[in-house]
Amino acid sequence: SNEDDIARINGIISPLVKNGQSLHQIYLAHVDELMCSEKTLYNYVDAQLFDIRNIDLPRKVKYRPRYKKPEFKVDRGCRIERSYADFQKYLGANPETTIVQMDSVIGRVGGKCLLTIHFVESSLMLAFLRDANTSASVIEIINLLDEVLGAKTFNSLFPVILTDNGSEFSNPKEMEKRSTIPCNRTKIFYCDPSAPYQKGACEVNHELIRRILPKGSSFDELTQQDITLMMNHINSYKRKKLNNRSPYETFSFYYGEDVLKRLGCSPVAAENIILKPKLLKK
């Protein structure tokens, strides 16, 4: 992991270890923020990347070090019955299903990033600024949308969500459940590893974001207001594939203006659309 991520994890775990908590306890309480396996935490402590050492851990010093494999793999249990093949099977059985694609757009590594939500049918895209690329921040946004739209509208807009294997999307059960009832607001599926083309519609729209926020640029000084403004310009941009209508107009035709207002979307007149970095220059 990069230095910023290690600093972020260190900020979470070191104070708690100094209060006498075990890594296991801390991991259970902060799994969504930590974004790594419990084993990785021990590896980082061994490598002396944190403010704490093995001697600080309540029980670690009593144990003889085990044989270490050269590397470990992230648990992909979350993908069971949610693979791309399962997605295609589901669409075969439910051909009328509206598809939503979800992804992240990264700013400066370790800094603020975006969660993007793309409605394939209308090409409308929502984007949300997040302080860190964690699964907790993704779940928070889905909960917020559920609240703003209401259960009925949310269910009709988000029957299925296709996303990639990023660790920020590795808690599907929390994304799918409304309060305590499992699988009752959406169904999460994953693209095959290294197959971004499987959610190509989303990737194409990211090219428009990159016209305004070029790769490598920092999002740290931006606000959600900036991101909403950018998406209003992108969603008002007419597309050939939509019969020369904009995503805003197309989405409005399917779901009505009221839903767009609740999502924070506003139209921008064609002659005022700017898809260059100067749109967000302060």
Feature-to-residue mapping (PLM):
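Secondary-structure boundary/capping micro-motif
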Residues: 1-218, 222-223, 229-232, 237-240, ...
